[in-house]
Amino acid sequence: MHYCNNGNISNWKVFRRLWPIINPFKIGLIIASITLIINAVSDSLMLALLKPLLDEGFGKANRSIFMWMPLVLMGLMIMRGMSGFASTYCISWVSGKVVMHIRRLLFNHIMNMPVSFFIEQSTATLMSRITYDADQVASSSSGALITIIREGASVVGLCIMMFYYSWQLSLVLILIMPIISIIIKLVSNKFKDIGKKIQNSMSQLVNSVEQMLKGHKEVLIFGGQHLEQNRFNYLSNRMRQYTMKMVQTSSVFEPLIQFVASLALACVLYIASIPSVIEMLSAGTITVIFSSMIALMKPLKSLTNVSAQFQRGMVACQTLFTILDLKTEKNIGKFSVKRVKGHIIFDNVTFFYPETNTPSLCNINFNIESGKTIALVGRSGSGKSTIVNLLTRFYDVYQGRILLDGLNLNDYTLTSLREQVSVVTQNVYLFNDTIANNIAYARTRFYSRASIEEAAKMAYAMGFISKMKNGFDTIVGENGILLSNGQRQRIAIARALLRNCPILILDEATSSLDTESECIIYKSINILKKNRTSLIIAHRLSTIENADEILVVERGSIVERGIHVDLLNHKGVYSQLYKFQFS
């Protein structure tokens, strides 16, 4: 499920797809566009004041010009200031709304992606997409929009004014426009290519930081500081190089456009120096035209830069749409149930992980009666956790079927199915929230504090919770870093008790605990297992001796099954594992 950018998609197609996101806020865009045009027109009108000032005010000593000119100038400045404020506010409002909407779309889409997607994609890359890329879409596009409208209106306004006063001199502009258009077209492709490289470099840079932070203890214990530093230095330098390529291209581009514009300016000066032409023009007209051509330099420069800015936004937008095009979890089931009995059947189930040719499970068959306990044992990588992943529909079976209360697992809605299952794993994830909110995660509105406390008591968690200063309101830190492994496990068991699901899955729930903690945890687990269909994965075979049936999994197949005593007497794989563990 790898995703990539399709460089053949045109900017127009990308923008056309972005438009439905922008469309609800088009009122802000319309106001911003109008005020940007007003802002540009006010600049042009201020230049136009030079003609009456020079021809009438100084040339003919008309004092009335000096009386009304300051008032007009002040009015134009007020108009310019107010339109500038309105345009900036509206554009910021629209871009803020757009980036918020894109982030929400992306967040919700990623949250509903299948587990396989997260195995293939790094956390840092996805975080970069939601934060950096989403911001690039809004900031680059809004910045480009401001430039295109305001500077474009300035160019149009100045050109109209120049043609109005002397169309003969202004014809030179028509000659240079095709040249400028060709240059912009050629450089735009270069900007797009560099923009993609910058985006990918940023993602890799964030990934490097994430690995160092998550593996900080390993970095320290193995002395990997030099390795991580070199990796980060290389990636940050590559990011700098791509950024400099963008600057270099832009720096060459700008003078080239300005040189073409200066040629036009030189042509105007030359034409204006011809006696037959100069007789037709006043000092004010020459000044306005010449000043307008100089004033054109700034908007032309900005318009040449807008290509790089716009390309960054479109590249980021294309990447985000590529993710949004990926299919979320398949949820075609229609059946919803409040509470199942918990009768599970694996019927000739075969499963391949994506992009592998060897089956992880092959012809798996077993039956768990409602309220019974089945244990899965076997060496690491034998396929035990895969069975759990199929039961929770993190993956779908390749061949065969899984039945729950006689109904195919695929016929249940994902929400309804997962409401029937409580899972306690070896690596418990706790959110950076209170103990109470972690126990009642995603159900805080449905459970009272009394029921949360009761679940904690049954999970033997009250002992350490009551000793904490804030009790159930204690913040546990990121991934419960302020708690020990045993404490985190008891929180997870309390969470499972509170959910009170008919099916319980214990995946190596005690493998990382010391003996004392394990004894406490198993008191909780024995309470948790009552009247529930339980599926237990365990390396410590002493913990599953009382299971109703033990399945020995080897290379994706069930090679032995039975109760503890019978399997020991059978002198097979289970017996070997047991003897090896207790030798």
Curated annotation (Swiss-Prot):
EC number: 7.5.2.6
Source organism, top-level taxon: Bacteria
Occurrences of domain ABC transmembrane type-1 (ranges): 30-312
Enzyme class: translocase
Record field: transmembrane: 18-38, 65-85, 105-127, 143-163, 167-187, 252-272, 277-297
Pfam entry (one): ABC_membrane
Residue positions binding ATP: 378-385
ABC transporter domain residues: 344-580
Intracellular or extracellular location(s): Cell inner membrane
Any one cellular-component term (Gene Ontology): plasma membrane
Alphabetical list of SUPFAM superfamilies matching this protein: ABC transporter transmembrane region, P-loop containing nucleoside triphosphate hydrolases
Topological category with respect to the lipid bilayer: Multi-pass membrane protein
Protein task: Involved in lipopolysaccharide (LPS) biosynthesis. Translocates lipid A-core from the inner to the outer leaflet of the inner membrane. Transmembrane domains (TMD) form a pore in the inner membrane and the ATP-binding domain (NBD) is responsible for energy generation.
Family affiliation: Belongs to the ABC transporter superfamily. Lipid exporter (TC 3.A.1.106) family.
Subunit structure: Homodimer.
Alphabetized NCBIfam families for the sequence: MsbA_lipidA, PRK11176.1
Entry comment, domain topic: In MsbA the ATP-binding domain (NBD) and the transmembrane domain (TMD) are fused.
Protein name listed in UniProt: ATP-dependent lipid A-core flippase
Organism: Blochmanniella floridana
Underlying gene: msbA
